[in-house]
Amino acid sequence: METPSSQPEHRSLLGLVLRLAALTLVGGLLALLVWRVVNAGQGGRLVNAVRKHKKPIAPDFRLGVLWPHAETWPRSTRNLVRSKVELRSLRGRPVVLNFWASWCIPCAHEAPRLVAAAKTHTGRVLFLGVDVKDFSSDARKFLRRFHVNYVSVRDGGSGTYDAYGLTGLPESYFLDTRGRIVAHKIGEISTVELEDGITQALGGGR
């Protein structure tokens, strides 16, 4: 049975535990904030490097496959579509990297153009969608609605969003065969812009 003298000790111990828990939480939040700031800074530098035509290497990622339809991919690369896709494993082929979300109206506007371009360049150019800030169920409905004919992966956090310096959706990056970014489009992409980026990606590996 607790004595009156032991009760203050228990309260003191409980207070210490609560303070330590609060400090741990604050420390974790600060670490997350620092990580976001650093990543966002790296993303900004990446965008600036692309703007200056420095052809930086695209930040690597390994993300879960949301949509495994690889019918427009070269047959030799279709075995890469498992539970996850690693960007660096796609080197050797030009890549159109499209960041999107199901709630994004401009993403819906450009989706048919991406599907058409993927079909036109079947076997020559890899189209890869990256779904961000979205629900998986809504994203799959979007992909079914537009009969998307290329693979999409999903980032449930903000890693790729920050690493690529995204300022909104959609955004598209064009990678050459060496994994270097040769073109970048912010916002809804037109057919002309899409073909121009693909031309740069096809020629950029030389």
Role assignments for model-derived ranges:
Residues 93-95, 100-103, 168:
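Short pre-active-site segment immediately N-terminal to redox-active cysteine/selenocysteine motifs
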Residues 109, 119-157, 169:
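Conserved segment of the thioredoxin-like fold in thiol-based oxidoreductases
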Residues 61, 70-71, 85, 99-100, ...:
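Conserved hydrophobic/aromatic "anchor" residues
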Residues 62-95:
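A short beta-strand-turn-helix
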Residues 99-116:
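Conserved redox-active cysteine motifs that mediate thiol-disulfide chemistry
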Residues 95-97, 128-130, 173:
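Conserved hydrophobic packing residues within short motifs/helices of P-loop NTPase cores
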Residues 1-74, 206:
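N-terminal targeting signals for export/organelle localization
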Residues 141-149, 154-206:
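Thiol/disulfide oxidoreductase modules built on the thioredoxin-like
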